[in-house]
């Protein structure tokens, strides 16, 4: 060996261990030494003979990296000499860390040699040595075997039986806990070898499964020995077990979860170990959700997590630490338990998690233990994201709990309540804001009396959330004192973080107030404009300063939507220019805010915003093409190439990061692109091709933008359709034999269609599948079958239907990616709300197709009938409800051309008359009414059982009686059930009044009017009322004063809707159509004519009502 070369290498390595000239030494190693095969024997020589242990260890680490690159370039005699000497020094080296470096080099060489059967005696000899008398020798042999298994080569498969026999013995070694831990880790890698085989050997799988209790014993031993490092390593093994084929894990997964729960709740155990246990349970929910749900472990997990969440925390840190990032990443048992509750509530049905949390509210909130009171409020705050519908149904318990929290004498409980309200408003928005009268005085009082900056901040954030969603007609009485308060808060705080929260609250007040904000608009801009001056100059600004500037942009644009174009006009151009400056800065957050500003202004100015397209769109395209992934490496291309050659997979991964800031920026830029396309219509056409090209790349390659990019693609398609004067929902019904849009428009639709369908069958991200189906459902509903087929080609329609069918059967890739072979599908388990959403959107595709295809849909539905009707029988209320609701909508789509009337009617009547869920019964009533309306066959046999069921529903004493019957019935569900039942009765009476006892039916019907939701059901109700008046039926004429009251309420709501449409913030009332009291102008005219008739017939009775007097004037 060249001694000079060896000396130079050793000196260079020494520079790294000493830290002197580190960068130069690293570059020298990469470029001058590691490219030469002779470096490998030299490094091994230093490993065995180096001057100090740190040098030896570094030489071993570097040698291991070079084995795969240079080993086969070394002559055979040198290779043989190295193998012999390494085995000798591995066992004779006194220092453990050097022994381990030596062992890993042996393992790397073994991986190279074993594949060609060039070192056949290595494994047998090590297995024999591992069974020897000397503890250190056994440990070293097992460590080498473990390192070999860790490097993973399929040539080790021939030794699986020997490994299982050895490690099943050494895992119980009485003299060394380290040997036991290494054996457990080695067994983990053996499991990968067993799985790697073409067919899993059942005997080997059984032997491995039998070793799991021994792994658990090792975990118990290392915990008792306070060996946190080994405890972590064993938990890593358990996490890997979750990914194994169920043949290898047997029935032990449930036992492992229960063991982890015991460890998690044991406060005597080291905190880090308890966190590992909680993280294991989170992993089990991720990878073995079906097993957890099937075993009904959710309640046990929830109770344990609540117990851990109640543990004492550092109160001072909680109240004064403004670092929210640190809070989210904190790994204490308490914080990990809250994260577990958050994950469990999103993965498991509400019956297993959210309902358990709600059950614990009374006891925990009344506890003398302040940490229990804090924990239950935080538990509610995380449960709402995973189970919003269930939490909404429990508002009678949850709202009082949060109010009690706000009134609590302990600041940390107040803080938890504020966090809870913030999260509730995030997920349930206007439903929470309905309680503004209870919340606002308490929150303002907390702001006024806050002694801790975190409480002040969260109180402002909670205020912000409430203000944003307070109803338009409720905000007015608060505006004047609130705006004065917010201006004062802005002036009296120097902290950018706190000012940021206040600015958001001002924006939210504007959002809620709409045109009522105009008197405060100029003053608000005066207060805020100083935060966005010299927008491009950000040098020296803190993150909070930049966030304040960005937040100000976003909220001023929200004000623009509130006060609308005329009031905003004088500020528009200078602020758009400032936003353009923001987009050109180096700050991703400022660029993001600039795009948000542009998106809002496009909403306000629509086609008038077109002049800005030529400057804004190139910046949007530039942003969308930014890399979300970064490879962090200091050096030139030559250095990078050298590093890539020598680095292992782990080192390469460590250099690779995802920039979430860029992802957020791209998401907002994509949303801005949507608004510009929809707002500027034909002015956007020159940019369509480039938009689709860039967005398609994002759907294929992006880390966090795929769903948003796909939504934007369809918004671009929509803008093209609107620009070509295609009116939504005015397309030819049925299968299109040709194209009813021009060729250019069709080409854009086809491109979007291809993108959406491209990987749908193999898509494993549930959120992406939901997005694809939502987009298809929305676009087909608005623009017809051309969205999915054209010119007689139904191949894409068939492909989409196949994917919808697989979702409804539960066999789509996104539903089976974590499927567990030993867990049968169990319909007794309620669906999680995410699963329910997936089924909902799949059914919504069918509903849209039925509307677009009308009678032609019957051919499509024939394949779906068994699955849809099968869902009627599901034990999951969510699945039953959405399936019954969808079937009812399908009846509406097919109308008189429905060949399945008898079958659908029979199935829906069973649900109406027997289902325990009010929501399901209400949905069934809707469908039964429609089927009766459109049936061409004799359906008189269903009248008696259906009317009996409807009377029971409509005659319920009050809403509380219904709520007591079905604990999950929200006010919305109750109102919807009333509307559907009323509409059903009216349709049946219109179809065959002889079969309906009108004397009893009409008073019961009128008792539930006016409707609070489901206003489309007014159509048959109004038709029935008019028909009865035409017949001069005393059943209705005797009710004339009541009819006047009802129509007065209807026109009041219609007037409110029109006022809301004119005065509320642009885009706030997205479902304005649902508030329409009359589905057509024709129906409105007919009602007005009826009112005029009643006024004449009944001595001016209608004119006496001030609302209706204006209507008939």
UniProtKB/Swiss-Prot annotation:
InterPro entries the UniProt entry points to: ARM-like, ARM-type_fold, HEAT_type_2, Importin-beta_N, Importin_beta, TOG
Further facts: Present with 38300 molecules/cell in log phase SD medium.
Protein name (Swiss-Prot/TrEMBL): Importin subunit beta-4
PANTHER family assigned to the protein according to its UniProt record, in alphabetical order: IMPORTIN BETA
Annotated PROSITE patterns: HEAT_REPEAT (PS50077), IMPORTIN_B_NT (PS50166)
GO (cellular component) term, any one: nuclear pore
Organism, as annotated: Saccharomyces cerevisiae (strain ATCC 204508 / S288c) (Baker's yeast)
Known partners and oligomeric status: Interacts with Ran (GSP1); interacts specifically with the GTP-bound form of Ran (GTP-Ran), protecting it from GTP hydrolysis and nucleotide exchange. Interacts with RPL25; this interaction is dissociated by binding to Ran-GTP. Interacts with YAP1. Interacts with histones H3 and H4; via their NLS.
């Amino acid at each position: 060996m060249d001694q000079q070369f060896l000396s130079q290498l050793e000196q260079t390595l020494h520079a790294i261990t000493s830290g002197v000239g580190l960068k130069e030494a690293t570059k020298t190693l990469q470029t001058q030494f590691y490219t030469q095969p002779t470096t490998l024997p030299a490094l091994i020589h230093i490993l065995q003979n180096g001057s100090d242990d740190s040098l030896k260890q570094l030489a071993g680490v570097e040698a291991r990296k070079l084995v795969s690159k240079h080993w086969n370039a070394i002559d055979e005699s040198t290779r043989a000499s190295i193998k012999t000497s390494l085995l000798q020094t591995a066992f004779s080296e006194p220092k453990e860390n050097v022994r381990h470096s030596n062992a890993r080099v042996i393992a790397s060489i073994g991986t190279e040699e074993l594949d060609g059967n060039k070192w056949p005696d290595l494994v047998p000899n090590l297995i024999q040595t591992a069974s020897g008398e000397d503890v250190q020798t056994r440990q070293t042999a097992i460590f080498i075997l473990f390192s070999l298994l860790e490097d993973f080569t399929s040539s080790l498969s021939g030794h699986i039986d020997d490994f299982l026999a050895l490690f099943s013995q050494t895992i119980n070694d009485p003299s060394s806990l380290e040997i036991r831990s290494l054996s457990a880790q080695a067994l983990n890698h053996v499991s990968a070898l067993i799985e790697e085989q073409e067919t899993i050997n059942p005997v080997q799988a059984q032997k491995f499964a039998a070793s799991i209790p021994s792994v658990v014993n090792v975990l118990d031993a290392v915990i008792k020995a306070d060996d946190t490092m080994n405890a972590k390593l064993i938990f890593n093994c358990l996490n890997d077990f979750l990914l194994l084929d169920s043949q290898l894990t047997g029935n032990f997964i449930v036992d492992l979860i229960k063991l982890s729960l015991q460890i998690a709740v044991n406060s005597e155990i080291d905190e880090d170990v308890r966190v590992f246990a909680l993280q294991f349970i989170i992993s089990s929910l991720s990878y073995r959700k079906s097993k957890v749900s099937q075993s009904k472990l959710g309640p046990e997990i929830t109770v344990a997590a609540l117990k851990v969440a109640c543990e004492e925390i550092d109160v001072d840190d909680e109240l004064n630490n403004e670092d929210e990032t640190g809070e989210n990443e904190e790994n204490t048992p308490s914080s990990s338990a809250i994260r577990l509750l958050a994950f469990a509530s999103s993965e498991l049905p509400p019956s297993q998690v959210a309902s358990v949390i709600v059950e614990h509210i009374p006891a925990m909130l009344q506890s003398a233990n302040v940490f229990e009171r804090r924990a239950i409020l935080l538990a509610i705050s995380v449960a709402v994201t995973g189970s919003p519908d269930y939490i909404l149904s429990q508002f009678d318990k949850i709202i009082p709990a949060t109010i009690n929290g706000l009134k609590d004498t302990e600041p940390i409980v107040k803080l938890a309540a504020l966090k809870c309200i913030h999260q509730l408003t995030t997920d349930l928005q206007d439903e929470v804001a309905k309680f503004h009268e209870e919340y606002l005085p308490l929150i303002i009082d907390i702001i006024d009396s806050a002694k801790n900056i975190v409480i002040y901040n969260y109180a402002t954030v909670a205020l912000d959330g409430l203000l944003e969603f307070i109803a338009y007609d409720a905000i007015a009485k608060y505006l004047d004192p609130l705006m004065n308060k917010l201006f004062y808060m802005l002036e009296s705080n120097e902290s950018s973080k706190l000012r940021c929260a206040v600015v958001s609250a001002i924006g939210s007040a504007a959002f809620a107030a709409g045109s009522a904000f105009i008197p405060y608009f100029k003053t608000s801009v005066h207060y805020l404009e100083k935060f966005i001056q010299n927008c491009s100059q950000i040098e020296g600004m803190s993150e909070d300063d930049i966030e304040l500037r960005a937040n100000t942009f976003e909220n001023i644009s929200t004000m623009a939507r509130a006060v609308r174009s005329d009031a905003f006009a004088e500020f528009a151009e200078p602020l758009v220019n400032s936003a353009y400056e923001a987009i050109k800065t180096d700050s991703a957050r400022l660029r993001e805010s600039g795009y948000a500003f542009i998106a809002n202004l496009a909403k306000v100015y629509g086609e008038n915003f077109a002049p800005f397209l030529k400057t804004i769109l190139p910046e949007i395209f530039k942003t969308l093409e930014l890399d979300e992934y970064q490879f962090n490496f200091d050096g030139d291309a030559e250095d990078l190439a050298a590093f890539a050659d020598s680095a292992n997979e782990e080192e390469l991964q460590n250099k690779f990061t995802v920039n979430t800031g860029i992802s957020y920026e791209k998401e907002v830029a994509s949303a801005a692109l949507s608004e510009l396309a929809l707002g500027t219509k034909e002015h956007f056409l020159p940019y369509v091709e480039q938009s689709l090209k860039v967005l398609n790349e994002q759907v294929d390659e992006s880390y966090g933008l795929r769903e948003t990019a796909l939504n934007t693609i369809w918004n671009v398609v929509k803008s093209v359709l609107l620009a070509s004067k295609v009116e939504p929902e005015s397309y030819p019904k049925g299968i299109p034999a040709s194209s009813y849009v021009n060729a250019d428009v069709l080409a854009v639709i086809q491109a979007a269609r291809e993108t959406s369908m491209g990987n749908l069958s193999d898509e494993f991200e549930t959120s992406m599948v939901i997005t694809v189906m939502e987009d298809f459902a929305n676009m087909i509903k608005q623009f017809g079958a051309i969205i999915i087929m054209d010119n007689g080609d139904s191949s894409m329609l068939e492909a989409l239907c196949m994917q919808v069918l697989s979702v409804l059967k539960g066999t789509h890739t996104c539903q089976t990616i974590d499927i567990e072979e030993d867990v049968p599908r169990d319909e007794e388990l309620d669906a999680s709300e995410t699963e329910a959403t997936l089924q909902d959107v799949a059914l919504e595709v069918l509903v849209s197709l039925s509307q677009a295809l009308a009678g032609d849909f019957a051919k499509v539905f024939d394949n779906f009938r068994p699955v849809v009707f099968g869902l009627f029988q599901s034990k999951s209320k969510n699945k039953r409800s959405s399936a019954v609701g969808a079937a009812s909508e399908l009846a509406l789509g097919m109308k008189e051309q429905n060949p399945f009337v008898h079958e659908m009617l029979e199935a829906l009547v069973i649900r109406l008359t027997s289902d325990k869920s009010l929501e399901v019964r209400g949905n069934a009533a809707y469908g039964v009414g429609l089927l009766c309306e459109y049936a061409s066959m004799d359906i008189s046999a269903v009248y008696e059982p259906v009317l009996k069921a409807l009377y029971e529903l409509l005659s319920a004493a009050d809403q509380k009686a219904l709520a007591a019957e079905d604990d999950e019935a929200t006010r919305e569900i109750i109102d919807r059930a009333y509307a559907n039942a009323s509409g059903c009765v009216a349709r049946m009476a219109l179809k065959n009044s002889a079969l309906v006892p009108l004397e009893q039916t009409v008073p019961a019907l009128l008792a539930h009017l006016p409707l609070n939701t489901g206003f489309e059901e007014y159509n048959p109700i109004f038709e029935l009322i008019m028909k009865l008046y035409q017949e001069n039926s005393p059943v209705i004429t005797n009710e004339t004063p009541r009819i006047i009251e009802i129509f007065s309420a209807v026109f009041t709501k219609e007037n409110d809707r029109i006022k809301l449409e004119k005065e509320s913030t642009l885009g706030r009332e997205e479902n304005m159509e649902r508030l329409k009291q009359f589905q057509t102008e024709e129906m409105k005219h007919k009602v007005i004519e009826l009112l005029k008739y009643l006024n004449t017939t009944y001595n001016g009775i209608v004119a006496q009502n001030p609302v209706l007097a204006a209507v008939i004037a």
